[in-house]
């Protein structure tokens, strides 16, 4: 069973050790970099929720949710008042086993509880040369909106 868990001193190093396949590293930042980004967001007064993804008691992935505009950074127009799945990764050892699909469903279920407050939309960005991610997000109802977050395409889901 998939569980989403907060990052603690007890699981930090297990989660930091998670990694994607070598060819995927250009598409997603590491857990360590993600945690630094979360720290900067939180220290600046923004909202970031880094989460470990567990299959039973085994850490299999990492996700990070953000809410609203981020402080001290250029924000995509869609960011204002909405949720963002800033990071989603499944460790290389657990890919191609359905873990990613189950984890993404659990993450969306959590976001739909509106943990940071009400919002009409959730958005995610991805590299155009990552068709697996594009198909996964589309299968959950995310639709490209024509905007970019840096060099990444943005897709949006109504909550």
Model segments located where?
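Acetyl-CoA-dependent GNAT
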Residues: 2-86, 91-93, 104, 110-116, ...
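Short, well-ordered turn and helix-capping elements at secondary-structure junctions
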Residues: 67-69, 89, 128, 141, ...
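Active-site acidic-Proline motif in GNAT/NAT acetyltransferases
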Residues: 91-93, 97, 128-129
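Short coil/turn segments at alpha/beta junctions that flank glycine-rich nucleotide-binding fingerprints
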Residues: 97, 117-118
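Conserved active-site alpha-helix within GNAT-family acetyltransferase domains
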Residues: 101, 127-146
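Conserved beta-strand-loop-alpha-helix junction that forms the acyl-donor binding cleft
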Residues: 118-134, 150-153
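Terminal substrate-recognition subdomain of acyl/acetyltransferases
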Residues: 143, 147-159
């Amino acid at each position: 069973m998939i569980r989403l868990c907060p990052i603690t001193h007890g699981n930090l190093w297990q989660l930091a050790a998670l990694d994607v396949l070598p060819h995927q590293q250009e598409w997603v930042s590491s857990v360590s970099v993600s945690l630094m980004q979360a720290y900067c967001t939180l220290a600046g007064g923004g909202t970031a929720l880094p989460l470990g993804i567990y299959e039973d008691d085994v850490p299999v992935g990492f996700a990070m949710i953000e809410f609203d505009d981020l402080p001290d950074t250029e924000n995509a127009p869609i960011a204002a008042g909405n949720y963002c799945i800033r990071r989603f990764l499944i460790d290389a050892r657990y890919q191609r086993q359905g873990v990613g699909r189950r984890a993404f469903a659990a993450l969306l279920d959590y976001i739909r509880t509106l943990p940071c407050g009400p919002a009409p939309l959730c958005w995610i960005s991805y590299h155009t040369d990552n068709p697996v991610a594009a198909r996964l997000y589309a299968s959950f109802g995310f639709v490209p909106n024509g905007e970019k977050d840096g060099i990444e395409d943005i897709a949006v889901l109504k909550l």
